[in-house]
């Protein structure tokens, strides 16, 4: 019995050392909601490509078409992600995310309907790029952590590490889940992904207390133009780097 108790105590101690810091962060007010919400809303990243591949092959019997459409969505995502990130910095998280989500939902419904009805291939080519209209949930979550924990470098690093863990979990779960659902039904896979987007977005975007101000808001409060504000912040960051290097 004593050996079992010692083993249990050792396991508990190790678990506390590994996960205790993460649990402390998630116990902070409002943090669990936006952190978990961002992971749920990110499900299109691992799921859409796999869903397109399996669904198109099923309805069109063409792996080449499936591969091309998946590549189009991936390229569009690579182009749109940094652009959306810049828009979020400029205008704010909710102001950019809400219209972006609406575009994604409409595109997902249109593409699902087109695939299941075996629409002409050119229709799929036109609709697929719009599935890259995904807000940068991970970056927005990290921005919230950084704002909340400003000045506390240790906990900020831990929070960013936690965000990375959540991202990895999303990919580990999303790909096999998309494969399973798409084999059953492409409509089911797209529907599940859409539900994740809506639930995750509601959890994240309705948490207003942790939303950082946009550059436009901060510049207005400082009585500066956005360009002047960015230059001032860049100069501050440069001074901090020089101080840390000294």
Label for each model-derived stretch:
Residues 130-169:
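Cytoplasmic helix-loop-helix junction between adjacent transmembrane helices
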Residues 13-78, 238, 245:
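Helix-loop boundary and gating motifs at the non-cytosolic
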Residues 39, 120-137:
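Hydrophobic core of transmembrane alpha-helices in multi-pass small-molecule transporters
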Residues 190-206:
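Symmetry-related core transmembrane helices of the 12-TM Major Facilitator Superfamily/SLC fold
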Residues 102-118:
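C-terminal ends and interior cores of transmembrane alpha-helices
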Residues 80-93, 182:
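Helix-to-loop junctions at the C-terminal end of transmembrane segments
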